[in-house]
């Protein structure tokens, strides 16, 4: 046997320590300028990029906390839930989609409404939540938006709705389209009574919501660079077969 036969070379061990994984949610990338931002610092700027002024989408709960005086907002209508009147099914049943949206947001529907105060002045407020099925307007959302305006009418206080929606909820068919008329009628009653309605247009505000109450404010306020219109660019491109 030779001198070095049967001799095994020792395996080299790396001196590098395994890098610990970065906890999820510490950083967020700006969709506009591409900067990597600390989530905690974004809270200080109210979810606005300090480099390019891009406005990140906010949940309905976050918007309420930003707008309302502390502990002044009295939520209502949380027990309202939609059904599946058309027994709608596509890739998933409507019932399954509702359960998934509930699990994702913790809300029974895509709109929060209630009475609260802004700098001491009482207002009737509705806030739409894009995280719940794209903020689409179904029967429950239509009922809540109408409630916001009806409460403003009864209490003689301003109505404010923060719009954030892809439009009418297709899973509810004609019942969702009826909400366009319902909400517009409630808004008209406010106008006749001389009670102000402020519509805040955030990204995105499109479809049946844009074609109804969202554009009917005495004052319409839009976030910078928000997508606002009846049809979004993807729908238009698919319709005309051209790139915008």
Where are these regions (language model features)?
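Long, charge-dense tracts
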Residues: 4-5
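An N-cap/entry alpha-helix motif that binds or orients negatively charged groups
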Residues: 11-20, 28-29, 56-113
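Residues immediately within or flanking Cys/His clusters that coordinate Zn2+
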Residues: 27, 46
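Short cysteine-rich clusters marking metal-coordination/redox-active sites
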Residues: 30-33, 49-52
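Cys/His-rich microdomains that often coordinate metals
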Residues: 36-37, 55-56
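Cleft-lining beta-strand/loop regions that shape enzyme active-site pockets
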Residues: 110-191, 198
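Conserved catalytic cores of soluble enzyme domains
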Residues: 163-244
């Amino acid at each position: 046997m030779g001198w070095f036969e049967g001799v095994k070379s020792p395996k080299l061990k790396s001196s590098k320590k395994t890098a610990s994984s970065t906890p999820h949610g510490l950083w967020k990338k700006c969709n506009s300028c591409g900067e990597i931002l600390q989530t905690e610092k974004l809270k200080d700027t109210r979810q606005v990029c300090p480099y390019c002024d891009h406005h990140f989408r906010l949940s309905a709960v976050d918007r309420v906390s930003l707008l309302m005086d502390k502990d002044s907002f009295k939520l209502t209508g949380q027990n309202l839930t939609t059904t599946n009147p058309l027994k709608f099914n596509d890739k998933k049943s409507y019932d399954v989609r509702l359960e998934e949206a509930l699990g994702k947001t913790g809300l029974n529907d895509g709109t929060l409404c209630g009475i609260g105060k802004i700098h001491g002045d009482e207002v009737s407020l509705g806030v739409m939540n894009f995280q719940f099925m794209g903020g689409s307007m179904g029967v429950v959302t239509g009922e809540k938006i109408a409630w916001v305006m009806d409460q403003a009418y009864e209490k003689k206080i301003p109505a404010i709705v923060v719009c954030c929606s892809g439009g009418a909820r297709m899973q509810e068919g004609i019942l969702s389209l009826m909400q366009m008329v319902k909400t517009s009628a409630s808004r008209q009653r406010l106008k006749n009574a001389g009670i102000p309605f402020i519509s805040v247009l955030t990204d995105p505000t499109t479809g049946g919501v844009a074609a109804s109450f969202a554009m009917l404010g005495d004052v319409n306020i839009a976030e910078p660079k928000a997508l606002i219109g009846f049809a979004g660019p993807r729908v238009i491109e698919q319709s005309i077969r051209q790139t915008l």
